[in-house]
Curated annotation (Swiss-Prot):
InterPro entries: ATP_F1_dsu/esu_C_sf, ATP_synth_F1_dsu/esu, ATP_synth_F1_dsu/esu_N, ATP_synth_F1_esu_C, ATPsynth_dsu/esu_N. This is ATP synthase epsilon chain. Pfam families: ATP-synt_DE, ATP-synt_DE_N. The gene is atpC. It comes from Geobacillus kaustophilus (strain HTA426). The lineage of its organism: Bacteria, Bacillati, Bacillota, Bacilli, Bacillales. Its main location: membrane.
Length: 133
């Protein structure tokens, strides 16, 4: 089966690099499925799970926003943060979720509320992806 090369990169360095059969991500415009030979595309990503299919198995990566760049032979995910399902520290993610929930319940200005809301989304995404491994 044809494959496409995928790189998931964060400011801290590469998180994943391999050839896969299909990449599925959630862009701001909706779900995208990328196969080898896909037309060039750049899309902003939501906080969500990237699904990488290879050999009948699916690997999951928690992606905290960023951008997707697609070329016919390569997909690059540039994310602020990304973690493979098996690398997620569930206890740390649960603590981050609880911290964000407490910040949301306290009365704060709009900027802090928005930051707490994003922190909660990131923590919930990490927990969701950790369960998929």
């Amino acid at each position: 089966m044809k494959t496409i090369h995928v790189s998931v990169v964060t400011p801290d360095g590469p998180v994943y690099e391999d050839d896969v059969e299909m990449v599925s991500v959630k862009a701001k415009s909706g779900e995208l499925g990328i196969l080898p030979g896909h037309i060039p595309l750049v899309a902003p990503l939501e906080i969500s799970a990237a699904r990488l299919k290879k050999g009948g198995k699916t690997q999951y990566i928690a992606v905290s926003g960023g951008f997707l760049e697609v070329r016919p032979d390569k997909v690059t995910i540039l994310a602020q943060a990304a973690e493979r399902a098996e690398d997620i520290d569930v206890l740390r993610a649960k603590a981050a979720k609880e911290r964000a929930e407490r910040r949301l319940q306290s009365q704060q200005d709009d900027i802090d509320f928005k930051r707490a809301e994003l922190a909660l989304k990131r923590a919930m995404n990490r927990l969701s992806v950790a369960e998929m491994k």
